[in-house]
Amino acid sequence: MVVAVKGPYTSKPRPALVVQADLFNPTHASVTICPITSDCVDAPLFRVTLPPGDRTGLTTASQVMVDKIVSVPRPAVVREVGRCDPAYLDLIDEALCRWLDL
């Protein structure tokens, strides 16, 4: 799920991808996310590019920053803005496994 998250360094909510297991989403005090940036770089091993559109809720091509995985307090997640297609989730899963050496 693509969400808008309020961070400590900006007043404007930023997009992020929830990577935490659905089992823990309703009950845990924090949510594990990978931030999403529109500042795309050539790093296919740990940055997955998502397309803009109604499905993702993104206005421009953006990258999931697997290398910046973090847990944030549940109240920091402002709202859901979109969803990620299964093919992209598979790429993100592979990148997470690679980054975390799982």
What are these regions (language model features)?
Residues M1-L102:
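Conserved functional hotspots at enzyme active or ligand-binding sites that engage polyanionic ligands
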